[in-house]
Amino acid sequence: MSRLKEKFNTEVTENLMKEFNYSSVMEVPKIDKIVVNMGVGDAVQNSKVLDNAVEELELITGQKPLITKAKKSVATFRLREGMPIGAKVTLRGDRMYEFLDKLIAVSLPRVRDFHGVSKKAFDGRGNYTLGIKEQLIFPEIDYDKVSKVRGMDIVIVTTANTDEEGRELLKQFGMPFQK
């Protein structure tokens, strides 16, 4: 069992029960899934770029990404409906906890001028979205093999009803929010 899952079962559940006065353990919010999305706009001209992005995303998450396709045609971007333009991975279960642990303990501290993640990136339903400017912060990525610096979106979906509950859940896991 991963370190964060164990922490959730022992400490986090108790702390949240006390803080929000839940009557049942089943009311305690938990992390449902983590979606890692990488939009690759350059894939329109060169499909090789998408292969590199997929490979990097697989290294980072340990799971094969799903290639996302364009929903609409946009003439200004030379984009046709159904063209591959990105990749995403949905993590659940143990892999999700492992990824979150790695993100909090290793990757985020490697960001340049890092002062914590924004407290305002909640969507009103307790889900948290985090944008990362470069994939180099992950230890699996070899600096010499990177052809282009790419960013990604990480969405942490929780079962929390409010942003306050979601924020407290992530804070208990050790998410470094700004002061």
UniProtKB/Swiss-Prot annotation:
GO terms for biological process: translation. GO terms for cellular component: ribonucleoprotein complex; ribosome. Coiled coil: none annotated. Keywords: Ribonucleoprotein, Ribosomal protein, RNA-binding, rRNA-binding, tRNA-binding. InterPro entries: Ribosomal_uL5 (IPR002132), Ribosomal_uL5_bac-type (IPR020930), Ribosomal_uL5_C (IPR031309), Ribosomal_uL5_CS (IPR020929), Ribosomal_uL5_dom_sf (IPR022803), Ribosomal_uL5_N (IPR031310). Transmembrane segments: none annotated. GO terms for molecular function: rRNA binding; structural constituent of ribosome; tRNA binding. Part of the 50S ribosomal subunit; part of the 5S rRNA/L5/L18/L25 subcomplex. Contacts the 5S rRNA and the P site tRNA. Forms a bridge to the 30S subunit in the 70S ribosome. This is one of the proteins that bind and probably mediate the attachment of the 5S RNA into the large ribosomal subunit, where it forms part of the central protuberance. In the 70S ribosome it contacts protein S13 of the 30S subunit (bridge B1b), connecting the 2 subunits; this bridge is implicated in subunit movement. Contacts the P site tRNA; the 5S rRNA and some of its associated proteins might help stabilize positioning of ribosome-bound tRNAs. Belongs to the universal ribosomal protein uL5 family. This is Large ribosomal subunit protein uL5. It comes from Staphylococcus carnosus (strain TM300).
